[in-house]
C-alpha cells in the first residue's frame, strides 16, 4: 500500500524487501533490496538509514537462503559471516569493507518458503504453536515505546519451549548437537537456542555475539549505548528509571566527596537534597568540582558471587551539556575482552552449579532443591543482562532462557512483567534488563523478579509436547511456523491456562 502511494519511497521499498525476506520470499525480497541499493545519495547528501542497512540485509538474505534446508545444528552464523562484515553491520557503519567477498547469489534449486496452513500440522504441533504464542505474550513489556509483535512472541515462545526441553535433556545426562558436534550443553548453547529464534524472527537486526567479533574490534571495546535524554528528546522507554538512576548518582557523588572533600560534604549533601531532576545535577557538580566542566561520568559495579568482595564493571552513566535543553544523559556498557572474560568465568561457575543441582532435582524434586535451582537461573541471567554480550536482542533472549530453564526445573512463570509502579516496594519496574542492571546484586534481582513472576508448578501436559528442535530443524521449517496463521488458537483451550 505504501509503494502504491509513493512508488519511489526508500523506506517503503526497504520494508518491502525486509518483509519478503522475513517470510522466506527471497527472490522478491532481494529484488526490492537492490532497488534501494541503486538509490545512491547525491554528492554532499547524507545517506539514509535504509541505504546504510540494505547491503548488509542483502548479504545476510543470501546467506539465509543458501542455508534454508541445512540442519541448524550443522553450522554457526557467528563463525560463518566475515568478521569485518559483522563488526560494520552491528555498528551500522557504511558498507566499506576491504577485500569483502560477496555471498553467492540465489541458487535456483533452493525454492522460496511456501505458506504452511495451520491445519496441515499434526495436532501435537498445533498445540506446540498455541502454547508458544501464549508464552511469548508473557514477555511483552507494558510500557510506552514497546509495541507488541506477535511474530517475536511466537519465536521466543518456541525458544522458551526448546530451552526447557534441552535443559531437561542435559540434566538427564543427554548430549546435544550444536555446530556440527555432539556434546554436553554449555550455558552459551542454552542462549544460542533463543538467539537463533530471535534472529530469524527479524532479519533486519544483527543479533551477534560480541566476543566473536574481530580481535581489533574487541580490543577497542564494543559499546551498547542508550540515550535517556538528548536535548529536548526524552526516551520514554526508560522514564521509570530516571529517579532510581538519579538516587544512585547522588550516592556516588557523596561517596566521592566523602573521600576527597570531607570538609565540604555537608554542603554537597544539602545541595543534592534540592536536586529532583537529572538536568539539575550539572550545575551542582560544576559548583563543587572544577574538573566537571561540561559533564561527568559515574560507573556502576556488579558484585561477584564466585569471588566474595570482588566487583565487575557494570554500566557507565554519562551526563554532559552546558544548560537545560542541551543535555545528554546516557548509559552504556563497554564490552571489552577483559570484562567479557570476567563475566564468562562468573556465568561458567553458576552454570556448573546449576547443572549439578539440576541433575539432583531430576532424582529428588524437593522444595529446597527447586528453590536453589530457581535462584541459580535468575543469578546466571543477572550476569548475562549486565554483560550485554549480544549486539541486539539481549533482553528478550535472556527472558526466554529464564522462562525455559525455570520450566525445566518444574516451575513456570504465571505473572506478567509489571506495567509500572504498583506500590513503593516491589512491583515497581517495567524493564527486566534495566532492573538487573540497576539491582545492587544478583540476590536483589532474584528477589524482585520472583515477587511478580508468581511461579507455580508446571502443567504435566508440557511433557507431551513434541520436540521443538526435531519439529523445526531447519530455517525453512522455522520460517514456515512463524508465518502460519494460528488465530484459532484463541478458540482452543491452551494447555497452560
Regions found by a protein language model. Give the residues of each.
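Canonical positions in the second alpha-helix
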Residues: 2, 35-36
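FIC/Doc superfamily catalytic core
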Residues: 53-497
